[in-house]
Amino acid sequence: VSSVISSSLFEKMLLHRGFYTYDAFIAAAKSFPAFATTGSTDVRKREVAAFLAQTSHETTGGWPTAPDGPYELGSTSDYFGRGPIQISYNYNYGAAGKAIGVDLLRNPDLVTSDNTVEFKTALWFWMTPQSPKPSSHDVITGRWSPSSTDKAAGRVPGYGVLTNIIDGGVECGKGQESHVADRIGYYKDNLDCYNQKPFA
């Protein structure tokens, strides 16, 4: 992953990253060997740009007074949205914890107190199909082909389906939404950092 995104580029893309560090991102990515290593260099760069765009939206761009998005960082054991992709609900905490080897059901606050665990949960969500939806990784790397069910649900290849996977119930199918424009804006900004704009 470090061959696709340098520390200086990471810092440029995430100006208000606060708690989220390059070293934690790289350490977490090592647990998901297919992340940013699938396809051509352009595909790998698009994947990093898309991942960081989606996580930037989920954390409100990392504004300094909210390093983990719009949620209070209390020490509760509730399974509310935490981390760069805002995993929620006990079933996601359980599955993510099992995948990364950490008991997040008993220790959900690790998703706000350990920056490597935070990135691991986000990458777990990114790399794992969210049934009946595909993984974001398979979409952005071109490895996914929509089924007739996907097409009927409006899921077709492209950046938009990533939002459907991550937060479709809240943001999709409602016409023009500021949330959607925000996600697209981060993606375009990140692609500019890679000198890959405009993309077809």
UniProtKB/Swiss-Prot annotation:
Give the record's keywords alphabetically: Antimicrobial, Carbohydrate metabolism, Chitin degradation, Disulfide bond, Fungicide, Glycosidase, Hydrolase, Plant defense, Polysaccharide degradation
What EC designation does it have?
3.2.1.14
Question: What is the active site of this protein?
Answer: 58
Concerning Gene3D superfamilies, the annotation shows:
1.10.530.10
**CDD domains (UniProt xref):** chitinase_GH19 (cd00325)
Provide one Gene Ontology biological process annotation: cell wall macromolecule catabolic process
A GO MF annotation of the entry reads:
endochitinase activity
Please indicate which superkingdom the organism of origin belongs to.
Eukaryota
Coiled-coil stretches are: none
What enzyme class is recorded for this protein? hydrolase
Any Pfam family the entry gives: Glyco_hydro_19
Q: Which reaction does it catalyse?
A: Random endo-hydrolysis of N-acetyl-beta-D-glucosaminide (1->4)-beta-linkages in chitin and chitodextrins
Note whether Repeat occurs among the keywords.
no
Q: What family does the entry list?
A: Belongs to the glycosyl hydrolase 19 family. Chitinase class I subfamily.
Summarizing the function annotation, the protein's role is: This protein functions as a defense against chitin-containing fungal pathogens.
Q: Report what the protein is called.
A: Endochitinase
